[in-house]
């Protein structure tokens, strides 16, 4: 959370993320009740820690901007599983649908990684389908790059650079 007033900086000095820990809703509620002409912007929430019901509750706050960066990583459940992501593309789209019900022009941006090890053309096409269905304002597209010491770096089925570049 960032605010125009310095006092917002220390309002809640730790990460307040997961719903099971109370989530960010109490902080948004407190800030929303402050008089003044300002907006609250959330960024980079992960579908693994929120769900459609949680998003629906957050949308009742008037000062909350109708923009969210919600990282998908992939539209393929196969690739999401390989990435050890604890959500499916269907769960991701449930969140998007709630946002669109609230405001058809709700600004949603995302990250998509192409060329993750073992990604097939069908997996890639699932990501394209998710992009089309979600109607993102912007997609931050990245080619997978091997990082020493990560589980993915040691996986079989590394995708050749020319295929990653094409995708």
List the model feature ranges, each with a label.
Residues 1-121:
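Conserved SAM/AdoMet-binding glycine-rich loop
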Residues 6, 32, 47, 88, ...:
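Auxiliary Fe-S-binding modules of radical SAM enzymes
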């Amino acid at each position: 959370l960032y605010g125009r007033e310095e006092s917002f900086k220390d309002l809640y000095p730790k990460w307040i993320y997961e719903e099971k820990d109370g989530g960010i809703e109490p902080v948004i509620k407190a800030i929303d009740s402050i008089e003044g002409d300002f907006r609250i912007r959330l960024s980079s929430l992960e579908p693994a820690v929120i769900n459609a019901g949680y998003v629906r509750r957050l949308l009742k706050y008037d000062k909350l901007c109708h923009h969210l960066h919600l990282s998908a990583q992939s539209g393929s459940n196969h690739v999401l599983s390989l990435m050890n992501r604890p959500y499916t593309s269907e769960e991701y789209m449930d969140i998007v649908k709630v946002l669109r019900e609230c405001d058809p022009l709700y600004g949603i941006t995302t990250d998509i990684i192409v060329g993750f090890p073992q990604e097939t053309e069908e997996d890639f096409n699932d990501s394209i389908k998710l992009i089309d269905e979600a109607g993102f304002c912007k997609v931050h597209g990245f080619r997978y790059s091997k990082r020493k010491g990560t589980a993915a770096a040691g996986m079989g089925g590394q995708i050749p650079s020319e295929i990653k570049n094409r995708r």
